[in-house]
Amino acid sequence: MLVESWLARAARMRPHAIALRSAAAVLSYAELDEAATRAAWRLSALGVRPGERVALALPAGAAFAEALHGCLRLGAIAVPVDLRLAAAERAVRTERCAAVLDAPLEGAQDPGAALARHHDLDAVAIVVHTSGTTSAARPVALTYGNWLWSALGSAVALGLDPAERWLCALPLAHVGGLSILMRSAIYATTAVVHDGFDAQAVVEELDGAGATLVSVVPTMLVRLLDAGLRDPPALRAALVGGGPIAPALLERAAAAGVPTVATYGLTEACSQVTTGGPALFCTRLQIATGGEILVAGPTVAPGARAPDGWLHTGDLGALDDEGNLTVVGRVADTIITGGENVAPAEVEAVLASHPAIAEVAVHGAADEHWGERIVATVVLRPDATATARELAGYCGNRLARYKVPKVFRFVPELPKTHTGKLLRRDLED
């Protein structure tokens, strides 16, 4: 099935609406559409042909957006690359690319190049790499249909305002950040793009210019609240995802007048799967034997579907009678201690409610007697104190005895990815 290029449609329907705003540039849809055509001509002049991959090793901002839409206009496949990766990591992501863009596109153009004004929904648009929190990062080929259905599902779940201003401070090589650019183009609304996450800058943006949506991981929300975010005037929702969300954090946000929506998603499902509990209208959920979350629907990348048609997420969860999903953790993270299964997220949620704790991560370590012992790695709030005995007692009043950590480690910070997601595999045994 063919659909009109969403950027071309946005430029036709709302030429003067702001497509992108960054610290260095403001582009209307007419301007971004023209820039995408020039970028496509320049890519063609470099020898890039439809169906070939183009690595985008560019900072977040106008140059990235122009190159991204230039790839789509030419019919090439964009491959965003995180600039913070080591050279060897970048090489893995770019080895199959016909071109690597590490500077804004300039130079010769090929005005005779055939341009794509319509998209085949089954064609691959962008290859996004997973964050690699539990294993090596994997490439996921997302189609135009994946992006379109993801945008439609999100709009139904959140509502859509023509004056939407969606703030992105996530890396554009991450599906959560990239989806803001893609959805904004599909909706013909505004993407407000920050090059990196600076808590004070985001607070000022939310307090001043009035973004209506912002996407964050839990660590980012903590830092925004620490930086003084209170009652942002235009914010409809802070979408919080990318890892388990402690109820205490959502309560803290509510007390500060910050509306939050807990989300669950993954790269293979083109970002969002659930928003505020229920699945997107176009997405089906199932809990397999053992508790693994299975996902199906048009947002799931074709290459991520198992022979049974489902995406096996590797995440643990439960569905209530109304179809609301609660994510418990990762299948691989489950701790088996004394023959009992313990989900780290359950223990983390209890510890996160302790007033002295800023962040906590729980994992299992080999133990001759128990098989695995539960270890809690704790970051205390500034000027706060707590002892292992105190925290064990706190857990003992709220959890079954076998779920109480046997070891508490106090550290200045937790190991995380560039996007702020916990690297559980890097926790010390």
Residue ranges and their predicted role:
Residues V3, A8, I18-G47, E52-A55, ...:
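Conserved AMP-binding/adenylate-forming core of the ANL superfamily
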Residues H16, G112-H129, A136, G145, ...:
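Conserved pre-ATP/AMP-binding loop-to-beta segment of ANL
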Residues S28-A30, A125-L152:
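Conserved AMP-binding A3 loop
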Residues A55-A57, F64, L68, L72-V100, ...:
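Short beta-strand->loop structural element characteristic of the AMP-binding/adenylate-forming
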Residues L148-R165, A173-L213, A227:
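Conserved AMP-binding/adenylation subdomain of ANL enzymes
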Residues G208-V216, M220-L221, L225-G276, R284:
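Gly/Ser/Thr-rich phosphate-binding loop
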Residues P259, A279-C282, Q286-T313, A318, ...:
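Conserved ATP/PPi-binding loop(s) of AMP-dependent carboxylate-activating enzymes
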Residues G297, L316-K403, E413, G420-L422, ...:
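AMP-binding/adenylate-forming catalytic core of the ANL superfamily
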